[in-house]
C-alpha cells in the first residue's frame, strides 16, 4: 500500500479488488452501506419470449426465466444479465434508465415489457414507455431500506451509487464544502445536487470500477 494521499468513503460495499487497487495508489477507501436490499418472493413471472427490462443488479439476481428478450442498463447490470441469461438474450442496452426507455421505444416492435425493479424505483423508464403506448408490467422483486448513520470523520471524497443512498446519507450527515463527491450516474448526481453545492464528478457509465478509477485519477493526477 502506498502512503495515503486521500481518504474516500464509499456508500456501499466494494469488492476487495477495487479497494486494494485504490490503496495501491494511495487512496484509502472506507465502505459503509447506507441502504439495505431485502429480496421479495415473486410468484407471477413472464413466460418465454417475453420482453424483460432490468436497470439494477439486484433485480437481475432476483429473476429466473428463459427465452426472454432483455433490455438492460450497461455496466454491472449488463454483466450480470450476460452471466445469468447469456449474451444472446440481450436485445438492447443503454447507460441510464431514461436512455434505455428511448432505446426500447426506438425499436418500434415492443408492445409490452416486464420491468423487474425495487419498491423505490424511479419513474423515468415506465413513464416514458407508457407515454409511447407500451404496456408495462412491473415486477417488484426487492425492497430498499434506508440505513442512515453518522460518519465519524471528514473524507476527501465520497462515492454514491444510487439516489436512494444519497437521501439516506444526507438525512444524517452534513459535509464540508471542500469534499469531492462522485456519482455512479446522472440521476445520482442530480440527487446529490439537491442537498449541497459541492462539485460532483459523474462516471461515464454506471459501473463501480469506472467510478473508482475516476476517484483514483482525480486524486493522483494533480
Feature annotation, model-predicted:
Residues 1-222:
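Signature of uroporphyrinogen-III synthase
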Amino acid at each position: 500500500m502506498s502512503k495515503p494521499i486521500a481518504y474516500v468513503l464509499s456508500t456501499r460495499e466494494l469488492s476487495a479488488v477495487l479497494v486494494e487497487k485504490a490503496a495501491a495508489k494511495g487512496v484509502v477507501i472506507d465502505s459503509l452501506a447506507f441502504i439495505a436490499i431485502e429480496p421479495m418472493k415473486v410468484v407471477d413471472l413472464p413466460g418465454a419470449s417475453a420482453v424483460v427490462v432490468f436497470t439494477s443488479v439486484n433485480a437481475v439476481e432476483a429473476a429466473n426465466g428463459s427465452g426472454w428478450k432483455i433490455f438492460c442498463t450497461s455496466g454491472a447490470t449488463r454483466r450480470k444479465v450476460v452471466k445469468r441469461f447469456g449474451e444472446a438474450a440481450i436485445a438492447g442496452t443503454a447507460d441510464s434508465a431514461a436512455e434505455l426507455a428511448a432505446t426500447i421505444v426506438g425499436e418500434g416492435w415492443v408492445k409490452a415489457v416486464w420491468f423487474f425493479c425495487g419498491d423505490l424505483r424511479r419513474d423515468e423508464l415506465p413513464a416514458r414507455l407508457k407515454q409511447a403506448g407500451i404496456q408495462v408490467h412491473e415486477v417488484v422483486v426487492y425492497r430498499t431500506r434506508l440505513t442512515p448513520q453518522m460518519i465519524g470523520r471528514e473524507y476527501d471524497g465520497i462515492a454514491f451509487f444510487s439516489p436512494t443512498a444519497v437521501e439516506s446519507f444526507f438525512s444524517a450527515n452534513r459535509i464540508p464544502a471542500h469534499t469531492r463527491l462522485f456519482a455512479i450516474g446522472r440521476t445520482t448526481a442530480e440527487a446529490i445536487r439537491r442537498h449541497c453545492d459541492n462539485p460532483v464528478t459523474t462516471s461515464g457509465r454506471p459501473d463501480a470500477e469506472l467510478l473508482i478509477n475516476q476517484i483514483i485519477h482525480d486524486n493522483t493526477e494533480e
